[in-house]
Amino acid sequence: MMSDKPIRIGMIGLDSSHAPTFTQLLNDKNHAYYVPGGEVTVTFPGGSDDFDMSYSRVEGFTVQVRDKYGVKIVDSPEEVAEACDAILMVSVDARVHLEQFRRIAAYRKPIFIDKPMALSSSDAKAIVELAQLHHIPMMSYSSLRYAEALTEALLTSESGSIIGMDCYGPLALQPTQPGLLVWCAYGGDAF
């Protein structure tokens, strides 16, 4: 039997535009794409001092999720894990994902790790191994693969199968994020 109580979702990382977006979708019952069943209730802002896309946005997104959606702000990933049923790790700086996950793995909370899961295959492997060790359901992907326009195009292709496409997306190289890994996921989602 399902509970009428929403799943308490904790969020780690308020330096990504996904933080207020996901919070809105889960907490705002009047939103056109509201997702019932869960609610973001607690979050740790995080942030990376050497990554402009992180430190320049963390304060504004923190204020937004706290003031607009009433989400409790805490001082550590561990406090998030203690106070929730499931976790969204949306830190924009993927360099911190492994360390953040190490800090909360023992809590055994199901987790979504926003793209990219890691910046190296060794970090990704370590995250997967930790999840397996602690029996944690974990997933990581870019949500654009589920964008309405893309899924509709795949369903309505006149020839039955798509044989080619041009993809583009944001491509600002970041000194702390190697190569195209951070942003190439968006264009690659269509494949």
What residue spans do the PLM features occupy?
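Short helix/strand-capping hinge loops at secondary-structure junctions
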Residues: 108-110, 115-116
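N-terminal glycine-/serine-/threonine-rich beta1-alpha1-beta2 phosphate-ribose binding loop
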Residues: 2-107, 133-134
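A contiguous active-site-proximal alpha/beta segment in oxidoreductase catalytic domains
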Residues: 118-177
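Rossmann-like dinucleotide-binding domain that binds NAD(P)(H)
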Residues: 170-191
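Hydrophobic residues in well-ordered beta-strands that form the structural core
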Residues: 75, 113, 138-140
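A structural signal for well-ordered alpha-helical segments within the folded catalytic domains
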Residues: 16-20, 98, 147, 184-191
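Short amphipathic alpha-helical segments and helix-helix/interface helices
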Residues: 23, 62-63, 101-102, 124, ...
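Short, glycine/acidic-enriched loop or turn micro-motifs at the edges of active sites
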Residues: 16, 117-118
